[in-house]
């Protein structure tokens, strides 16, 4: 009896050992190919009928029970509908732009000055009062990448720098005039073939070294919209979709007064709404200024989120709060009035506030102490 039990136990152990060896030596199943992954992703989104439905469309169907739900048969169609439904439904509550602040990003691609197109928007009445200061400071070092967009002929300005574009737009500070200039800026950038488009106003100082570092951390072929919103929530607008139909739309936008940048990859996708005069008609759909229209095209129509960057500064913020020890890291600065007080960065330098109310000359000497007109004994 004992011998029989022992024989059975040995046979059971041998069988278990053989099964383990077969499992260990068997080839693992091959990983799914990309197309199969796509089909599985679509199946995971499918309802009982086996047909995938884009998120956001279910909510729309629930709001209108009789409305048909669009069927999705491929990943590309799914993401297209996802973008469209995001535009229609609006951003989720508390949604915010992706931040670019924090530790420096690794370099994605080295950039040369000729890779960047900086458009400076101005008007003829400010050629002397504002542009002369920029030409004396940061533009003097970076004429190759800077293009001035104005609304009137100025032979003296044209002789001083070769990159002056008379847009023939109105000199009024109106929604239509601002959009007219932005339309010309966009078209000139596309024609230039450069990698990055950056827009600033004539009251901005651009720290080009910091700008190149920032842009170099993003591939220009990807969809990148960099800037700083002036609002703490998405702007709400009314989008005209036909003669008798409007609908609400929500989106973030980077304020033009602080400057913003757009990659070439994204700018090319904006073409149906921005090129060849389409920008002005797009602006009329929401009846908002040029910088808002940029945000509308990028966020609401293309579904690309704004990347918030605190290194851009406008006169709408308290510039006294920018630490003097971090001025070399800032991409743009500004000046003006804030709460009925003079608003400029706080920096010690060779020029008094009376002689340098914008503090741009002092900032320039801080960044470029070898400038010929900067005092050699300057203390910052």
Curated annotation (Swiss-Prot):
List of residues binding substrate: 130, 202
Residue ranges, Cytoplasmic side: 1-8
Catalysed reactions, semicolon-separated: 3-O-(alpha-L-fucosyl)-L-threonyl-[EGF-like domain protein] + UDP-N-acetyl-alpha-D-glucosamine = 3-O-(N-acetyl-beta-D-glucosaminyl-(1->3)-alpha-L-fucosyl)-L-threonyl-[EGF-like domain protein] + UDP + H(+); 3-O-(alpha-L-fucosyl)-L-seryl-[EGF-like domain protein] + UDP-N-acetyl-alpha-D-glucosamine = 3-O-(N-acetyl-beta-D-glucosaminyl-(1->3)-alpha-L-fucosyl)-L-seryl-[EGF-like domain protein] + UDP + H(+)
Disulfide bonds: 169-180, 198-261, 365-374
Name of the featured protein: Beta-1,3-N-acetylglucosaminyltransferase lunatic fringe
One GO term describing the cellular component: Golgi membrane
Side Lumenal, residues: 30-380
Key word Coiled coil present: no
Binding site for Mn(2+): 203, 315
Principal place of residence: Golgi
């Amino acid at each position: 009896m004992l011998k029989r039990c022992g024989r059975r136990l040995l046979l059971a152990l041998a069988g278990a050992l053989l099964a383990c060896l077969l499992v260990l030596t068997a080839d693992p199943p091959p990983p799914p190919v990309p197309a199969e992954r796509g089909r599985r992703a679509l199946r995971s989104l499918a309802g009982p009928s086996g047909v995938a439905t884009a998120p956001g469309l279910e909510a729309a169907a629930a709001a209108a029970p009789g409305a048909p739900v669009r069927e999705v048969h491929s990943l590309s169609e799914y993401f297209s509908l996802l973008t469209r439904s995001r535009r229609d439904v609006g951003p989720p509550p508390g949604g915010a732009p992706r931040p670019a602040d924090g530790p420096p990003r690794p370099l994605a691609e080295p950039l040369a000055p000729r890779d960047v197109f900086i458009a400076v928007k101005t008007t003829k009445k400010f050629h002397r009062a504002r542009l002369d200061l920029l030409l004396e400071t940061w533009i003097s070092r970076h004429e190759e990448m800077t293009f001035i967009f104005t609304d009137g002929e100025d032979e003296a300005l044209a002789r001083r720098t070769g990159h002056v574009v008379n847009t023939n737009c109105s000199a009024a500070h109106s929604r239509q005039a601002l959009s007219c200039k932005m339309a010309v800026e966009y078209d000139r950038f596309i024609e230039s073939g450069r990698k990055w488009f950056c827009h600033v106003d004539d009251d901005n100082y651009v720290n080009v070294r910091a700008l190149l570092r920032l842009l170099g951390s993003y591939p220009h072929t990807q969809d990148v919209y960099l800037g700083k919103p002036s609002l703490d929530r998405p702007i709400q607008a009314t989008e005209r979709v036909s003669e008798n139909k409007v609908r609400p739309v929500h989106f973030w936008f980077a304020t033009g007064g602080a400057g913003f940048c757009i990659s070439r990859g994204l700018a090319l996708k904006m073409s149906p709404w921005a090129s060849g005069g389409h920008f002005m008609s797009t602006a009329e759909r929401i009846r908002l200024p040029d910088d808002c229209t940029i945000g509308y095209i990028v966020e609401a129509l293309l579904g690309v989120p704004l990347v918030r960057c605190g290194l851009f500064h406008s006169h709408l913020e308290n510039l006294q709060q920018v630490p003097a020890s971090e001025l070399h890291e800032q991409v743009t600065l500004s000046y003006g009035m804030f709460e009925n007080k003079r608003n400029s960065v706080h920096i010690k330098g060779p020029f008094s506030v009376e002689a340098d109310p914008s503090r741009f000359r002092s900032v320039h000497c801080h960044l470029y102490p070898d400038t010929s007109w900067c005092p050699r004994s300057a203390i910052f």
